[in-house]
Amino acid sequence: MPVTDPIADYITRIRNAGVAKHKTTDIPHSKLKERLTVLLEEKGYIKSHTVVQGEKFPVIRVHLKYDMYGKPVIKEIKRVSKPGRRSYEGKDIRKYLGGLGLYILSTSKGLLTDKEARSLGVGGEVLFSIL
């Protein structure tokens, strides 16, 4: 069955794996998903990732990160801009929860966090929020 919203599928797979306390989760590969994974890794929300050949197609194997109590580092991850209701922010992007979390934006400069987009003075589509 085809996925109508690949970013929502990506978010759901990461959220479900964290709740189930899995060490890794496999996500169907695409360039966008790989860039999102690299961004989450840079910001410390996941341990690492590798691209491996699945049964038919390549997959991104995401190694999840947990705190010292065994709880997932990703407390909350939500899709903001959806296929039926797109959400855009201008260059004066608001902070997510007063700066505790991040917005991930798709901008003309590539995928950026809200802080990076504010410093570059660009806006874009708010893909999801993460805490």
Swiss-Prot record:
Domain of life: Bacteria
Keywords noted in UniProt: Ribonucleoprotein, Ribosomal protein, RNA-binding, rRNA-binding
One cellular component term from this protein's GO annotations in UniProt: ribonucleoprotein complex
GO molecular function: rRNA binding; structural constituent of ribosome
Keyword Manganese in record: no
Entry annotated with the keyword RNA-binding: yes
InterPro entries assigned: Ribosomal_uS8, Ribosomal_uS8_CS, Ribosomal_uS8_sf
SUPFAM superfamilies recorded: Ribosomal protein S8
GO biological process: translation
Function: One of the primary rRNA binding proteins, it binds directly to 16S rRNA central domain where it helps coordinate assembly of the platform of the 30S subunit.
Subunit-level organization: Part of the 30S ribosomal subunit. Contacts proteins S5 and S12.
Membership in a protein family: Belongs to the universal ribosomal protein uS8 family.
PANTHER family xrefs: 40S RIBOSOMAL PROTEIN S15A
Protein name listed in UniProt: Small ribosomal subunit protein uS8
